[in-house]
Amino acid sequence: MRLRSLLYLALLSAVPCFAQSTPYTDLVTLFNQWRAFEHPLVHDGVPDYSAKAMAAQAAELPKWQKRLAAINTTGWTIQQLNDLKLVHAEMNGLDFNLRVLKPWARDPAFYVNVLPARSDVPSREGPILHPYTELYKFKFPLSAADQKTLTASMTAIPAILTEARENLKDSNARDLWVYGEQELRNQSQTLADLDANKLTVSTLEGSQIADIKAADPALHAAIINARKATDDFVAWLEQLAPTKTGPSGVGKDNYTWYQQNVHFIPWTWDEEVTLLHRELERAQSSLRLEEQRNRNLPQLEPAANAEAFDKLTNTHLDKFVDFLVQQQILPDKPYLKAALEPQSGHFVPEDQRIFFTRVTHREPMLLYSHDYHWIDLARMRDEPNPSPIRRVISLSNIWDNRAEGFATAFEELLMHAGLYDDNPRAKELVWIMLANRAARGLASLYVQANEMNLEQAAKLHSQWTPRSWARLDKLTGFEQLLYLRQPGYGTSYITGKLLFDRLMTESSRQDEIAGQSFVLRDFMDQFNDEGMIPIPLMETELISKEAREP
């Protein structure tokens, strides 16, 4: 890692000097200042998302955009130019939030700010207020300093939710309002479990009980008050829900602008519909062909009890990591198994299973493949990117097509690489997983276009997932709400996968032009070294013009 950093700095110093060129370090300085501006003003732990404050931020944003545009990039490397594009995309993201999305004024779930579990992706999915409380970052039992910090955070929640009522009073986004209530109920339950010493918090390293038995009475009182304020807020949402009748999606044109100018997706809303239909059809037809091939084999039965599940996950974790290393897909790193092991899950009775546990109780390597997320997080922790801009997680979930798209692509990649050659029935699960992602992404597109509501989207999502494994349950509802709250997230699993397929195709073409063989391990090393940036930016850095698709 030290060598990578030194090489990166050497690359910076090797840039030719031009009289008009702006030093790259000026971009880094601007980036750090921009991040301070992007966050709201905070008074006594309460962020100011009032209409007046947001209007003031909107008035200042053009000045930041002008400062960025004034940077002279003559002589910059492609990596430095892409760092600038990332900063530009963040500014476009704030512009979109201020003009269109306005989560602080439309979306009640925006005000959920107590998080018990670390997300498996670089930052929290969807828009969220700042600051928020990451319970999993505390070490329990709490130190005196952490008790003080957590007490202050809990104490701020009633005032935050009081401001939320004022900010949301003109919202008419029905689905955001009605379905967002559940996210606040979840926060209430989190606070109740925390106060009762029953809350499990989870991180990359594993889980622990949030033990506050010995905490000061002031912390318990603050938690109780925060929960009451949350319950009162939910009651207020329920009371007004029947009056909410308006659309919640951003519309086709706004969706396309956001995807192209914030997430670097090259397609329009209509083109994404076509692409997701194609992946849904490919996944469904491939599943039926795999079932035909396996028709004389026994069905893949789920683990029947906790002992069987634990044995299955443990043995298949070792098999999975060995496959990655022995088949020369990834280098042997200490964090490979360490990142995945805490995410193995636990046995779930059949009548309580959701889509993903229906898969993992049959073949856990399917989710280990998608859990490349956790390998990403471990790599980011242990091998930080040499770029000071890429080292910081991009705003607006700009990383989604890299994180979710590649995790989805990795499932099929490993199948084709031979992971399930000794268990053909598991290949059926790969196609079921892909069909699920395509169906739910397609549904999310229709919701953003205001051609479906969330209830209709959940039905499409459920009906087009094979074997009725995605039922109209809490998971389906949660996913569709997230994809409504964060435009493009629901499609990123497929669009990112397609972009990865293109990158791999072009990389192999580039090797052919050079008279070399394509080596998957080398390609994966290059891909991972790029950092958590959108795949189209990687393409500009890794692929020569003559090797790109026409």
Give names to the regions the model predicted.
Residues Q20-P550:
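N-terminal maturation segment of proteins
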Residues M1-S5:
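Positively charged n-region of N-terminal signal peptides that target proteins for export
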